């Protein structure tokens, strides 16, 4: 009897969770991630875009949603669309302090695949300036050298 009650409560909780209004960053991020895992990429993009439009989120949170959209589109090899989200993310986070992430080299790669080498170099230089608060950004130095010496298509 108790297990039946617990099962019903769990079902009600899952139903509520799937229908609750999205109001916080975590709600948008988690819901979009779940949809992305189910390969419902269009729905995941829509959910994140709803969060981006919500001005109760901080610029850094909205930038993170753009970054997640960019990563998803990069996986789908939609490089130009991916870089549009990265552009928006960097614009929103321009004056914010955010930690180094190992995925930044993939971001730069997306710019190269989209034929935007100059923008890749500008972004890399901007990231390198962030060493003042996070020394891990120094790990992008070899990438900068590679960009400077690189000729042709990626």
What kind of region is each of these model predictions?
Residues 55, 93, 130-135:
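Alpha-helical junction/boundary sensor with strong preference for TPR arrays
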């Amino acid at each position: 009897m108790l297990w039946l009650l617990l099962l019903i409560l769990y079902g009600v909780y899952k139903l509520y969770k799937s229908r609750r209004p999205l109001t916080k960053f975590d709600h948008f991020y988690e819901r979009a991630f779940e949809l992305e895992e189910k390969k419902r990429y269009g729905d995941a993009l829509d959910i994140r875009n709803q969060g981006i439009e919500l001005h109760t989120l901080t610029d850094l949170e909205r930038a993170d949603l753009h970054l997640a959209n960019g990563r998803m589109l990069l996986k789908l090899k939609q490089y130009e669309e991916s870089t549009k989200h990265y552009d928006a993310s960097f614009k929103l986070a321009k004056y914010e302090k955010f930690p180094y992430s190992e995925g930044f080299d993939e971001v730069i790669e997306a710019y190269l695949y989209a034929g935007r080498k100059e923008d890749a170099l500008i972004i890399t230089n901007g990231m390198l300036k962030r060493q003042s608060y996070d020394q891990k950004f120094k790990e992008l130095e070899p990438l900068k050298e590679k960009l400077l010496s690189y000729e042709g298509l990626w």
